[in-house]
Design a protein with these regions (language model features):
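Alpha/beta-hydrolase-fold enzymes
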Residues: 197-320
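Alpha/beta-hydrolase active-site loop
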Residues: 148-171
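Conserved alpha/beta-hydrolase "acid-adjacent" motif
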Residues: 385-391
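Catalytic histidine-centered segment of alpha/beta-hydrolase-like enzymes
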Residues: 409-420
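Short, surface-exposed "cap/lid" segments of acyl-processing enzymes
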Residues: 91-136
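Short beta-strand/loop motif that positions the catalytic acidic residue
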Residues: 378-380
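N-terminal cap/lid segment of alpha/beta-hydrolase-fold proteins
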Residues: 31, 36-94
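Gly/Ala-rich beta-loop-alpha elbow adjacent to hydrolase catalytic centers
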Residues: 183-187, 191
């Protein structure tokens, strides 16, 4: 009888905890009568915005360019194609504000989300400069000073260096009235740290900064994404079968997209695999694993850490990488942080603990700055899958009226929705008023 009472108490406590969390989440929503059509957060994350609900955006002169960030650096031969950093621009003919776009985790400068943002801002009269995420392999080989990304401050320094060098190439060709920066997902997180760095460097003196669906803690978010792989039908014992099916779909997707693992991959793989809704978390987890595997292998080769390939082994452009890819695909991002990232940086900072490294890769580390500056605004979704319970409240508390929080949209699923695009542009043209 006592055990039954205990079980009942636990159930009631669980229900109250769930209701409390739901009520707290609802209380931070700032947008009412929101008509984004998808209410399931996993479906929204994968499917994005149905075409009929998307903002109407024009074709723009989106031009790919390259720049040598470290002229004296020797790139490993296996990455012979990664010596120069690739980026994209869309430039106006007259004096205009310039906006830098930072892509999300594993995505390139020309991925779907950055392209759509570029169209929206170019249409609004901005010069646009689009760069890849620091976690994109081309950025690791061409623009990361250490070759091991994930340190919030060091990544910001890398991005800032890229901005400076790109601006040095553009300065004689265009007239700029103000500088601005935005990014989505990890790119939004990066934008916050870049803005803080600019307060001391003062090269750009950014007028406005917009964070779109950023994580609060990188470690918390990657832990959530890593755990999603446990949703594979049949559990981890069926990883190989699910992964092979995904890779077959990926092969077909890749033929149609230069940025398959980036923005559009989830939706195309979802359609190709005809997955049920309950398998979407597994799809998200595995696709994130593919993205992180590329980063981990690239970093391991660049710094010769010996995490995936044997230390001292030199790979060239003709090397068979199959076995290394298979190993990398089995490694989670949290494994990277504990077994690669932390030991690598502990060599130069031996007094810093593992927990201190983890707490340093969080927006809470710069919370005082985020509270005090008026130039930074945030757009987020109350049901974002990369936020732990209670983390959405961080944005409402820290940013106050500078936070726009939608009730639905998952992780970046509503970025192309017409209302979101209008607000995104307004954040840079009239103070972000919805």
């Amino acid at each position: 009888m006592i055990s039954k009472i205990k079980i009942a108490v636990r159930c009631i406590a669980g229900i109250f905890a769930y209701l409390a969390s739901s009520m707290a989440t609802a209380s931070v929503v700032t947008v009412e009568n929101y008509e984004y059509p998808i209410t399931d957060r996993f479906v929204a994350t994968v499917v994005g915005t149905p075409t009929e609900y998307e903002a109407k955006l024009p074709s723009i002169p989106f031009e790919q360019r390259s720049i040598d960030i470290f002229p004296d650096r020797k790139t490993p031969d296996v990455f012979f194609y990664g010596k120069e950093l690739l980026y994209s621009v869309a430039l106006q003919d007259n004096e205009s504000p310039l906006i830098f776009l930072i892509a999300g985790t594993g995505a390139s400068h020309e991925g779907g989300k950055n392209r759509n943002m570029a169209k929206a801002f170019y249409q609004a009269g901005f010069h646009v400069v689009s760069i890849s995420s620091p976690t994109f392999n081309n950025f690791v080989t061409a623009a990361s000073y250490t070759g091991v990304v994930g340190d919030a401050k060091k990544d910001a320094e890398d991005i800032y260096r890229v901005f400076e060098k790109i601006w040095a190439e553009l300065a004689d060709d265009i007239e700029v009235s103000t500088f601005n920066v935005t990014g989505y997902s990890l790119g939004g997180f990066n934008a916050a740290y870049v803005a803080k760095l600019d307060e001391t460097r003062q090269i750009f003196n950014f007028e406005n900064v917009l964070l779109i669906n950023p994580p609060v803690s990188i470690y918390n978010s990657i832990s959530l994404l890593d755990r999603m792989i446990n949703n594979i039908p049949g559990g981890m014992d069926n990883f190989d079968k699910f992964f092979n099916n995904l890779m077959r779909a990926y092969t077909n997707v890749y033929k149609e997209s230069a940025d398959a693992i980036g923005d559009d991959f989830l939706y195309k793989a979802y359609k190709a695999l005809n997955l049920k809704d309950e398998q979407l978390a597994a799809l998200i987890g595995v696709s994130f694993r593919l993205s992180s595997a590329s980063l981990i292998f690239t970093s391991d080769v660049v710094v010769d850490f010996g995490f995936i390939k044997p230390k001292g082994l030199i790979l060239n452009r003709y090397s068979n990488l199959t076995e290394y890819n298979e190993v990398a695909n089995r490694i989670g991002f949290t494994d990277y942080y504990h077994e690669f990232f932390y030991p690598f940086y502990k060599e130069t900072d031996p007094d810093v603990t593992r927990d201190e490294f983890i707490s340093a890769i969080s927006l809470k580390e710069i919370e005082e700055y985020l509270r005090s500056t008026d130039k930074i605004t945030v757009m987020h979704n109350a049901d974002d899958i990369i936020l732990q319970p209670g983390e959405i409240e961080f944005f409402a508390d820290v940013f106050g009226k500078r936070a726009t929080i939608y009730p639905t949209g998952g992780h970046c699923g509503n970025m192309s929705y017409r209302d979101n695009v209008a607000h995104m542009v307004a954040a840079f043209t009239d103070g972000g008023t919805p």
